[in-house]
A protein has these predicted regions:
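Short acidic/polar active-site loop segments enriched in Thr and Asp
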Residues: 54, 111, 139
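Catalytic-site signature of metal-activated, phosphate-bearing donor transferases
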Residues: 2-11, 95-97, 124-219
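Short, acidic, metal-binding catalytic loop of nucleotide-sugar glycosyltransferases
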Residues: 46-55
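Short beta-strand/loop segment that forms part of the nucleotide-sugar
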Residues: 54-62, 83-86
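Active-site-proximal specificity loops/subdomain of glycosyltransferases
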Residues: 68-112
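N-proximal low-complexity "stem/linker" segments adjacent to membrane-targeting elements
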Residues: 1-46
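Short beta-strand-to-loop acidic/aromatic patch adjacent to the donor-nucleotide binding site
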Residues: 109-123
């Protein structure tokens, strides 16, 4: 059994009383694993900061465009709390995201975490992602993903046409991985009780675990 796993188990045991506790104050962090995201990273940071995210941890995996410049800009502004420059050429997404979660939890004392991609916008109907976090006694929130139809003449954050899922995509000769397929939900989770994130950030292992569907949507 690895030292990290032993440490996680120790934390889970000590945090048991906090597993489902409602709190009046929430520190919300977002992790981002990026590579060559100059076309969307800045808008992503600005959008989620306005939605209530308190801090970002970013892993940059060998970007060769202006992504590092954008990261430095928002590190200097204090929005990005830590940057990990990952030089590996294999894609260990689950391990790299887990590393960011662990830092957010143990170093920056985050209460809740969103593990996002640079091309995702996590939207709360109330205008603040924290509103639902204050009220829930769950420790995992399942968030519906909604595909957005690309519009060449607009930047991605201005696309406003959502795609309705097709129930029988093979009937229309559509790929099972197309925009028209129903997307798997993604999760927001507490740090208390955290054990492991899944590949793609669609599931998380917690102990104990109590999940609930969320009004937050991912576009």
């Amino acid at each position: 059994m690895s030292n990290l796993l032993l440490s996680k188990i120790g934390h889970v045991i000590s945090e048991f009383p906090m597993a489902f506790k409602q709190t009046k104050e929430v520190k919300l962090f977002m992790t981002l694993l990026v590579k060559n995201e100059e076309g969307m990273l800045e808008e992503n940071l600005q959008f989620h900061k306005a939605m209530g995210v308190d801090g970002f941890i970013i892993t940059d995996n060998n970007s060769t465009d202006s992504t590092p410049d954008i990261i430095r800009k928002y590190k200097q502004k204090g929005w990005i709390k830590e940057v990990i420059e990952e030089k590996a050429t294999n894609y260990e997404q689950k391990d790299w995201v887990d590393r960011m979660i662990w830092k957010a939890k143990t170093i920056y004392k985050a209460d809740w975490i969103i593990n996002a991609d640079a091309d995702e916008l996590w939207y709360a109907p109330t205008g603040n992602l924290k509103d639902e976090l204050y009220a829930t006694n769950a420790n995992v929130l399942n968030c519906e993903m909604r595909s957005v139809y690309p519009e060449e003449e607009k930047p991605f954050w201005q696309w406003d046409k959502t795609v309705k899922a097709v129930t029988e995509p093979e009937k229309y000769d559509l790929s099972l991985y197309s925009l028209f397929e129903r997307q798997n939900k993604k999760v927001i989770h507490r740090t208390a009780g955290y054990l492991q994130i899944s590949m793609g950030n669609h599931k998380v292992t917690m102990f104990p675990q109590k999940s609930a569907d969320s009004h937050i949507h991912v576009y």
